[in-house]
Amino acid sequence: MTPRDRAGRVLLVEDSEGGAQLMRIAFGERLPDAVLEVFADGERALDELDAGRLAEWDLVLLDLNLPGVKGHEVLAAVRSAADERVRRMPVVVLSHSEVVDDVLRSYDLGANSHIAKPHSLDALFETVETLGRYWLSVVSLPN
């Protein structure tokens, strides 16, 4: 996920401290140059979006079952953001639900991928690396 000029920045929106810690360890081992920041709820992600700071990230890993503002609400807000870079940013939904309606709703709202928890770290990082490489190559193109 790391391009020639900078490390990728990944935002994980995850309320489970155990899940967040697992991701910190996995990122440290598999993508040590990537910057991973964790928000424990969807409200924080929406605050960052409202403040215009969500564009600082290159990829969002988004849990669906968050306290307060749910993951689908965050995803809908990202996809309707005023900033085109934010609207197009890759979003990977992470969910314990494999209910077809939940998966379809994620894609209908614009998710780039929907990965069921507990997830295979290999599958997750393959997705992160593929979307990350693509996104970092797109955002570095001249306007």
Tell where the protein language model's regions lie, with residue ranges:
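Acidic, metal-coordinating helix/loop segments flanking the phosphotransfer/catalytic sites
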Residues: 38-59
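Residue-level signal for the "D+5" position in two-component response regulator receiver
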Residues: 38, 66-69, 100
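Active-site residues of response regulator receiver
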Residues: 62-64, 95
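Conserved acidic segment of CheY-like receiver
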Residues: 7-27
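A short, hydrophobic beta-strand element within the central beta-sheet of small alpha/beta folds
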Residues: 85-98, 106
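Short amphipathic alpha-helix used as the core "switch/output" element in two-component signaling
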Residues: 47, 72-87
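C-terminal output helix
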Residues: 119-130
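Alpha4 helix (beta4-alpha4-beta5 surface) of REC/receiver domains from two-component response regulators
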Residues: 73, 98-113
